Amino acid sequence: MKKITINDLIKWKQEGRKFATSTAYDASFAQLFESQEMPVLLVGDSLGMVLQGKNDTLPVTVEDIAYHTRCVRAGSPNCLLMADMPFMSYATPEQACENAAQLMRAGANMVKIEGGDWLVDTVKMLTERAVPVCAHLGLTPQSVNIFGGYKVQGRDQEKADRMVKDALALQAAGAQIVLLECVPAELAARITQVLDVPVIGIGAGNVTDGQILVMHDMFGISANYMPKFSKNFLAETGDMRKAVALYMEQVQAGTFPDEAHTIA
């Protein structure tokens, strides 16, 4: 697989070519994903739940993400590698720069941060200092205590309009990817259409430029709960490599997620 950059994703968006992405946490699975030419991997703070056994992502530290970023980069030298910035690691622009630098040195090509237009100054500071940013909107798991649980976001018109404005503001500030989680498919389509940057969805219908799944959900090995928008591709294939290939094939064809795996 050739080295993937943000320019490839932008070109694919312009061409209408959909792409699949996944979380990854170690070198072995990263190597598996690279063998199937998975273009983008995310070292997600979801590791707090699927690896550390926590109830949410809040306990994850920058050091945790940096460690797993090094592991994933070792297994997948050519993917575009995103790394989550954990809870309260970007409370100020200055703090964000310091912590993002640690993740970039660990091998990330981009950092992902959760939140709306209040992050504009942070995104500007990061991108002006050569740190690419993915902006995460919708259900932002680090805000679980504000939301009162993991709930669909943007269902009413006012909140939907606000999310569109947030997405445009973050793009203007320099965000190069927007990730939408658990938002109505109609809203995801609207945001995907108005943005020039690639939009990745999870639980947001099949209209976004890309899709992402938590690796453990894709393989049906999550310990407690399988979200409705996820699909066990391993159950259909009986082989992990074939499962990854099937996931990528269905995303590229626009057949995943289908209605059964769309939550709103």
UniProtKB/Swiss-Prot annotation:
E.C. number: 2.1.2.11
Localization annotation: Cytoplasm
Name of the top EC class for this enzyme: transferase
Cellular component annotations (GO), alphabetically ordered: cytoplasm
Cofactor: how and how many bound: Binds 1 Mg(2+) ion per subunit.
One of the GO biological process terms: pantothenate biosynthetic process
GO molecular function, one term: magnesium ion binding
Keyword Cytoplasm: yes
Residue numbers binding Mg(2+): D45, D84, E114
Keywords: Cytoplasm, Magnesium, Metal-binding, Pantothenate biosynthesis, Transferase
Catalytic activity, as annotated: 3-methyl-2-oxobutanoate + (6R)-5,10-methylene-5,6,7,8-tetrahydrofolate + H2O = 2-dehydropantoate + (6S)-5,6,7,8-tetrahydrofolate
Binding residue positions for 3-methyl-2-oxobutanoate: D45, S46, D84, K112
Presence of keyword Cytoplasm: yes
Known partners and oligomeric status: Homodecamer; pentamer of dimers.
Name this protein carries in UniProt: 3-methyl-2-oxobutanoate hydroxymethyltransferase
Organism: Vibrio vulnificus (strain YJ016)
Native organism taxonomy: Bacteria, Pseudomonadati, Pseudomonadota, Gammaproteobacteria, Vibrionales
